[in-house]
Amino acid sequence: MWLSEHWKDYELIDCGRGEKLERWGDQILVRPDPQAIWNTPRTHKGWKANNGRYARSNTGGGQWQNKSMPERWTINYGNLTFNIKPMNFKHTGIFPEQAANWDFAREQIKKAGRPVSVLNLFAYTGAATVACASAGATVCHVDAAKGMVAWAKENAKSSGLENAPIRWIVDDCAKFVEREIRRGKQYDAIIMDPPSYGRGPTGEVWKLEENLYPFVELVSGVLSDNPLFVIMNTYTTGLAPSAVTYIMETVISKKFGGHTESQELGLPVTETGLALPCGVTTRWTAK
Protein backbone atom coordinates (compact mmCIF):
# COMPACT_ATOMS: atom_id res chain seq x y z
CA MET A 1 0.00 0.00 0.00
CA TRP A 2 1.19 3.49 -0.89
CA LEU A 3 0.39 5.74 2.06
CA SER A 4 -0.19 9.48 1.86
CA GLU A 5 1.41 10.22 5.21
CA HIS A 6 2.98 13.66 4.79
CA TRP A 7 -0.13 15.78 5.29
CA LYS A 8 -0.23 18.53 7.92
CA ASP A 9 -3.49 20.27 6.92
CA TYR A 10 -5.45 17.04 6.43
CA GLU A 11 -5.94 14.22 8.93
CA LEU A 12 -8.02 11.05 8.85
CA ILE A 13 -8.85 10.99 12.55
CA ASP A 14 -10.99 7.85 12.66
CA CYS A 15 -13.25 5.69 10.50
CA GLY A 16 -15.83 2.93 10.86
CA ARG A 17 -19.53 2.07 10.48
CA GLY A 18 -19.42 3.35 6.91
CA GLU A 19 -18.10 6.82 7.79
CA LYS A 20 -14.82 8.66 8.23
CA LEU A 21 -13.94 11.50 10.61
CA GLU A 22 -11.58 13.99 8.99
CA ARG A 23 -9.81 17.25 9.71
CA TRP A 24 -9.51 19.62 6.76
CA GLY A 25 -7.40 22.48 8.07
CA ASP A 26 -9.35 23.54 11.17
CA GLN A 27 -12.66 22.05 9.99
CA ILE A 28 -13.85 18.66 11.27
CA LEU A 29 -16.07 16.76 8.80
CA VAL A 30 -17.83 13.38 8.80
CA ARG A 31 -18.32 11.78 5.39
CA PRO A 32 -19.47 8.36 4.13
CA ASP A 33 -16.88 5.78 3.13
CA PRO A 34 -17.91 2.32 1.88
CA GLN A 35 -14.56 0.78 2.79
CA ALA A 36 -14.94 1.56 6.51
CA ILE A 37 -16.98 -1.58 7.24
CA TRP A 38 -15.68 -2.19 10.78
CA ASN A 39 -17.66 -1.40 13.92
CA THR A 40 -14.92 0.11 16.06
CA PRO A 41 -15.65 2.29 19.13
CA ARG A 42 -16.18 6.00 18.45
CA THR A 43 -14.23 7.60 21.25
CA HIS A 44 -13.09 10.80 19.51
CA LYS A 45 -15.19 13.86 20.35
CA GLY A 46 -15.31 14.85 16.68
CA TRP A 47 -17.91 12.19 15.94
CA LYS A 48 -20.39 14.27 17.95
CA ALA A 49 -18.90 17.76 17.73
CA ASN A 50 -18.00 18.52 14.11
CA ASN A 51 -18.44 21.23 11.49
CA GLY A 52 -20.57 19.11 9.18
CA ARG A 53 -21.76 15.58 8.51
CA TYR A 54 -22.76 14.34 5.08
CA ALA A 55 -25.74 12.02 5.48
CA ARG A 56 -26.91 9.80 2.66
CA SER A 57 -30.64 9.61 1.97
CA ASN A 58 -32.59 6.39 1.46
CA THR A 59 -33.48 7.47 -2.07
CA GLY A 60 -29.90 8.15 -3.14
CA GLY A 61 -27.78 11.26 -2.86
CA GLY A 62 -27.66 13.03 0.47
CA GLN A 63 -26.98 16.35 2.14
CA TRP A 64 -24.75 18.10 4.63
CA GLN A 65 -26.14 18.34 8.17
CA ASN A 66 -25.15 20.42 11.20
CA LYS A 67 -23.18 22.71 8.91
CA SER A 68 -20.96 25.26 10.59
CA MET A 69 -18.09 25.13 8.08
CA PRO A 70 -17.50 27.99 5.64
CA GLU A 71 -18.53 27.62 2.02
CA ARG A 72 -14.86 27.44 1.08
CA TRP A 73 -11.42 27.53 2.65
CA THR A 74 -7.88 26.51 1.72
CA ILE A 75 -5.46 23.83 2.87
CA ASN A 76 -1.79 23.37 2.04
CA TYR A 77 0.26 20.37 1.02
CA GLY A 78 3.87 21.47 1.10
CA ASN A 79 4.10 24.42 -1.29
CA LEU A 80 0.71 23.65 -2.88
CA THR A 81 -2.54 25.35 -1.86
CA PHE A 82 -5.95 23.83 -2.59
CA ASN A 83 -9.42 25.37 -2.39
CA ILE A 84 -11.84 23.23 -0.39
CA LYS A 85 -15.56 23.52 -1.16
CA PRO A 86 -17.87 20.81 0.26
CA MET A 87 -20.27 19.79 -2.51
CA ASN A 88 -23.76 18.31 -2.61
CA PHE A 89 -22.38 14.84 -3.33
CA LYS A 90 -20.06 14.53 -0.28
CA HIS A 91 -16.82 15.53 -2.05
CA THR A 92 -14.62 18.45 -1.04
CA GLY A 93 -12.60 18.95 -4.22
CA ILE A 94 -9.49 17.03 -3.17
CA PHE A 95 -8.78 13.33 -2.73
CA PRO A 96 -6.09 13.43 -0.02
CA GLU A 97 -4.96 9.85 -0.65
CA GLN A 98 -3.65 11.05 -4.02
CA ALA A 99 -0.82 12.92 -2.30
CA ALA A 100 1.32 9.79 -2.67
CA ASN A 101 0.93 10.11 -6.44
CA TRP A 102 1.67 13.85 -6.40
CA ASP A 103 4.92 13.12 -4.57
CA PHE A 104 5.79 10.33 -7.00
CA ALA A 105 5.10 12.47 -10.08
CA ARG A 106 7.11 15.42 -8.76
CA GLU A 107 10.05 13.18 -7.94
CA GLN A 108 10.00 11.65 -11.43
CA ILE A 109 9.85 15.07 -13.09
CA LYS A 110 12.63 16.59 -10.99
CA LYS A 111 15.05 13.71 -11.47
CA ALA A 112 14.41 13.47 -15.24
CA GLY A 113 16.92 16.24 -15.91
CA ARG A 114 15.05 17.38 -19.01
CA PRO A 115 11.86 19.23 -19.95
CA VAL A 116 8.83 17.07 -19.22
CA SER A 117 5.34 17.40 -20.70
CA VAL A 118 2.44 15.86 -18.76
CA LEU A 119 -1.08 15.04 -19.95
CA ASN A 120 -3.59 14.91 -17.08
CA LEU A 121 -6.87 13.25 -18.14
CA PHE A 122 -10.10 13.30 -16.14
CA ALA A 123 -8.12 15.91 -14.26
CA TYR A 124 -10.89 17.08 -11.87
CA THR A 125 -9.79 20.07 -9.75
CA GLY A 126 -6.20 19.80 -10.84
CA ALA A 127 -4.25 18.72 -7.77
CA ALA A 128 -1.98 16.53 -9.90
CA THR A 129 -1.75 19.29 -12.51
CA VAL A 130 -0.59 21.78 -9.90
CA ALA A 131 1.83 19.27 -8.38
CA CYS A 132 3.47 18.54 -11.74
CA ALA A 133 3.63 22.22 -12.69
CA SER A 134 5.28 23.01 -9.36
CA ALA A 135 8.04 20.54 -10.27
CA GLY A 136 8.69 22.35 -13.54
CA ALA A 137 6.63 20.32 -16.01
CA THR A 138 4.51 21.65 -18.85
CA VAL A 139 0.99 20.31 -18.26
CA CYS A 140 -2.11 19.79 -20.37
CA HIS A 141 -5.15 19.54 -18.07
CA VAL A 142 -8.28 17.93 -19.56
CA ASP A 143 -11.70 17.49 -17.97
CA ALA A 144 -15.18 17.44 -19.50
CA ALA A 145 -16.67 19.58 -16.69
CA LYS A 146 -16.19 23.32 -17.18
CA GLY A 147 -16.70 23.98 -13.46
CA MET A 148 -13.95 21.55 -12.48
CA VAL A 149 -11.48 23.19 -14.86
CA ALA A 150 -12.35 26.60 -13.39
CA TRP A 151 -11.73 25.17 -9.91
CA ALA A 152 -8.39 23.75 -11.07
CA LYS A 153 -7.38 27.20 -12.30
CA GLU A 154 -8.19 28.55 -8.83
CA ASN A 155 -5.91 25.93 -7.28
CA ALA A 156 -3.11 26.88 -9.65
CA LYS A 157 -3.52 30.55 -8.78
CA SER A 158 -3.65 29.83 -5.04
CA SER A 159 -0.42 27.85 -5.42
CA GLY A 160 1.28 30.76 -7.18
CA LEU A 161 1.23 28.95 -10.53
CA GLU A 162 -1.23 31.10 -12.49
CA ASN A 163 1.52 31.83 -15.03
CA ALA A 164 2.87 28.27 -15.19
CA PRO A 165 2.81 26.52 -18.60
CA ILE A 166 -0.56 24.81 -18.11
CA ARG A 167 -2.96 24.28 -20.99
CA TRP A 168 -6.57 24.16 -19.76
CA ILE A 169 -8.95 22.02 -21.86
CA VAL A 170 -12.69 21.43 -21.36
CA ASP A 171 -13.38 18.36 -23.49
CA ASP A 172 -14.20 14.67 -23.57
CA CYS A 173 -10.90 12.96 -22.77
CA ALA A 174 -11.09 10.24 -25.42
CA LYS A 175 -12.08 12.68 -28.16
CA PHE A 176 -9.28 15.04 -27.13
CA VAL A 177 -6.66 12.26 -27.21
CA GLU A 178 -7.86 11.17 -30.65
CA ARG A 179 -7.35 14.71 -31.93
CA GLU A 180 -3.91 14.99 -30.29
CA ILE A 181 -2.86 11.79 -32.07
CA ARG A 182 -4.00 13.21 -35.41
CA ARG A 183 -2.06 16.40 -34.66
CA GLY A 184 1.06 14.40 -33.82
CA LYS A 185 1.19 15.79 -30.28
CA GLN A 186 3.15 13.73 -27.73
CA TYR A 187 3.63 13.75 -23.96
CA ASP A 188 6.34 12.37 -21.69
CA ALA A 189 3.95 11.40 -18.90
CA ILE A 190 0.25 10.68 -18.54
CA ILE A 191 -1.94 10.80 -15.43
CA MET A 192 -5.51 9.53 -15.69
CA ASP A 193 -8.37 9.04 -13.28
CA PRO A 194 -11.11 7.45 -15.40
CA PRO A 195 -14.58 7.18 -13.83
CA SER A 196 -16.17 3.86 -12.98
CA TYR A 197 -19.26 4.80 -14.95
CA GLY A 198 -20.32 7.72 -17.08
CA ARG A 199 -21.81 8.96 -20.33
CA GLY A 200 -19.95 10.57 -23.19
CA PRO A 201 -20.85 13.78 -25.04
CA THR A 202 -23.26 11.97 -27.37
CA GLY A 203 -24.76 9.69 -24.73
CA GLU A 204 -22.44 6.72 -25.15
CA VAL A 205 -22.04 4.68 -21.96
CA TRP A 206 -18.63 4.39 -20.30
CA LYS A 207 -18.02 1.36 -18.07
CA LEU A 208 -14.50 1.12 -16.72
CA GLU A 209 -14.26 -2.67 -16.92
CA GLU A 210 -15.28 -2.62 -20.59
CA ASN A 211 -13.54 0.56 -21.76
CA LEU A 212 -10.28 0.56 -19.83
CA TYR A 213 -8.22 -1.61 -22.18
CA PRO A 214 -9.12 0.28 -25.40
CA PHE A 215 -8.65 3.59 -23.58
CA VAL A 216 -5.14 2.65 -22.43
CA GLU A 217 -4.40 1.55 -26.00
CA LEU A 218 -5.61 4.95 -27.20
CA VAL A 219 -3.58 7.06 -24.77
CA SER A 220 -0.44 5.05 -25.47
CA GLY A 221 -0.55 6.73 -28.87
CA VAL A 222 0.31 10.14 -27.40
CA LEU A 223 3.32 8.99 -25.38
CA SER A 224 6.64 10.34 -26.60
CA ASP A 225 9.52 8.15 -27.76
CA ASN A 226 11.14 8.62 -24.36
CA PRO A 227 8.24 8.42 -21.89
CA LEU A 228 8.78 8.92 -18.19
CA PHE A 229 5.73 7.57 -16.35
CA VAL A 230 2.04 6.73 -16.52
CA ILE A 231 -0.23 6.90 -13.47
CA MET A 232 -3.74 5.45 -13.56
CA ASN A 233 -6.22 5.54 -10.68
CA THR A 234 -9.07 3.05 -10.49
CA TYR A 235 -11.69 3.31 -7.78
CA THR A 236 -13.87 0.44 -9.07
CA THR A 237 -13.97 -2.16 -6.29
CA GLY A 238 -14.58 -5.03 -8.73
CA LEU A 239 -11.38 -4.38 -10.67
CA ALA A 240 -8.40 -6.25 -9.22
CA PRO A 241 -5.05 -4.44 -9.11
CA SER A 242 -3.47 -7.36 -10.97
CA ALA A 243 -5.99 -6.90 -13.81
CA VAL A 244 -4.96 -3.27 -14.24
CA THR A 245 -1.30 -4.29 -14.12
CA TYR A 246 -2.01 -6.82 -16.86
CA ILE A 247 -3.51 -4.12 -19.08
CA MET A 248 -0.61 -1.72 -18.54
CA GLU A 249 1.94 -4.48 -19.16
CA THR A 250 0.30 -5.65 -22.39
CA VAL A 251 -0.11 -2.12 -23.76
CA ILE A 252 2.46 0.30 -22.30
CA SER A 253 5.27 -2.11 -21.40
CA LYS A 254 4.85 -3.94 -24.71
CA LYS A 255 5.61 -0.68 -26.53
CA PHE A 256 8.17 0.89 -24.23
CA GLY A 257 9.48 -1.75 -21.83
CA GLY A 258 9.74 -0.45 -18.28
CA HIS A 259 8.06 -1.58 -15.08
CA THR A 260 4.44 -1.64 -13.90
CA GLU A 261 3.23 -1.81 -10.29
CA SER A 262 -0.26 -1.64 -8.80
CA GLN A 263 -0.95 -0.89 -5.15
CA GLU A 264 -3.79 0.28 -2.97
CA LEU A 265 -3.64 3.91 -1.93
CA GLY A 266 -4.16 4.46 1.77
CA LEU A 267 -4.57 7.11 4.44
CA PRO A 268 -3.19 6.58 7.95
CA VAL A 269 -5.87 6.59 10.67
CA THR A 270 -4.76 8.56 13.73
CA GLU A 271 -6.96 6.80 16.30
CA THR A 272 -5.96 3.23 15.38
CA GLY A 273 -2.55 3.52 13.74
CA LEU A 274 -3.93 1.51 10.81
CA ALA A 275 -4.73 2.62 7.25
CA LEU A 276 -7.95 3.11 5.29
CA PRO A 277 -7.79 1.71 1.73
CA CYS A 278 -8.76 4.35 -0.84
CA GLY A 279 -8.74 2.75 -4.27
CA VAL A 280 -5.95 1.45 -6.47
CA THR A 281 -3.18 3.21 -8.36
CA THR A 282 -1.14 1.65 -11.15
CA ARG A 283 2.20 3.20 -12.06
CA TRP A 284 4.29 2.50 -15.12
CA THR A 285 7.84 3.81 -15.15
CA ALA A 286 10.45 3.66 -17.87
CA LYS A 287 13.04 2.15 -15.53
Q: What spans do the regions from the language model cover?
A:
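Conserved class I S-adenosyl-L-methionine
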Residues: G113-Y124
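C-terminal catalytic and target-recognition region of SAM-dependent MTase-like enzymes
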Residues: P227-K287
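Non-catalytic substrate-recognition/targeting regions of SAM-dependent transferases
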Residues: H6-E22, L29-P96, D103
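Conserved SAM-binding loop of SAM-dependent methyltransferases across substrates and taxa
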Residues: T125-V139
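Conserved alpha-helix/loop element of class I SAM-dependent methyltransferases that forms part
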Residues: P96-R114
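S-adenosyl-L-methionine
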Residues: A145-I191
